[in-house]
UniProtKB/Swiss-Prot annotation:
UniProt keyword terms in alphabetical order: DNA damage, DNA repair, DNA-binding, Glycosidase, Hydrolase, Lyase, Metal-binding, Multifunctional enzyme, Zinc, Zinc-finger
Keyword check for Zinc: yes
E.C. number(s) listed in UniProt: 3.2.2.23, 4.2.99.18
Family named by the database record: Belongs to the FPG family.
Classification via CDD domains: EcFpg-like_N
An annotated Gene Ontology molecular function: damaged DNA binding
Purpose of the protein: Involved in base excision repair of DNA damaged by oxidation or by mutagenic agents. Acts as a DNA glycosylase that recognizes and removes damaged bases. Has a preference for oxidized purines, such as 7,8-dihydro-8-oxoguanine (8-oxoG). Has AP (apurinic/apyrimidinic) lyase activity and introduces nicks in the DNA strand. Cleaves the DNA backbone by beta-delta elimination to generate a single-strand break at the site of the removed base with both 3'- and 5'-phosphates.
Gene Ontology BP annotations: base-excision repair
The protein's required cofactors: Zn(2+)
UniProt-recorded name of the protein: Formamidopyrimidine-DNA glycosylase
Subunit record text: Monomer.
Amino acid sequence: MPELPEVETTRRKIEPLLRGKTIERIVHDAPHRYRNTERAHGRQVRGLTRRGKYLLLHLAAADAAEDEPHDLELIVHLGMTGGFRLEEGPHTRVTFELGSGEKLYFNDPRRFGKVVAVAPGDYASMPTLAAMGPEPLSDDFTEAEFVALAARCGPVKPWLLSQKPVSGVGNIYADESLWHARLHPAQTRLNADEAGRLYRAIREVMAAAVDKGGSSLGNGVGNYRQHDGEGGGFQHSHHVYGRAGQPCDRCGTPIEKIVLGQRGTHFCPVCQPLRTDRSA
């Protein structure tokens, strides 16, 4: 699933293609998954922002003054395999027809992606978006608050994946951050030192992943690529994710893979020992 670095890279790549353009029509094949998109017809794209793993297209009437705020948001969630392309393909689910005559295609082989038009800030229909925590690279994500929350957390990796303590961290970047912080993925109730290490690791890993355009894990049709076919580069910096059985880059112990919270989870059993409460 595309996580924050992949979605942020997508935003940066497609914003120049859409900003200032009018959406003439949105054509799709599943009204239950792509909801209220007709509300975007005839509206101009003012800009694109991102919240966690969600893209938000800011739309306004085509004749609205430049200083008028946008009055509609088109929320795009890439799901497991969604992404934008410049050419239609067998997995195209949504077509954005622009007033310029150009088209942008949303491809999604596994059909978990969503496109929903809402009033600005009206995220009641998307509870994960409405309740998610601060952006990991923003000033709103503070070490003091994170340490306080982590002191009473359950198993730390599922806690991160809930999006409540911090937004945009998924399977890949949770595993990588926990390796950098030397924390077992099932560790509970982090002490201040552990939580501080994890806080700093999240910021460092996410910044590096954004800088390298995210992670591309293969060449299959569902693997992450940008609209121009370019992949990410952070997969070459993975220390644990996808490396089960390979030696840890820090100590040489084979990386293990377990299932935790129904998610495949990679860690080093030596560098990331599970602490007992007695050793807190």
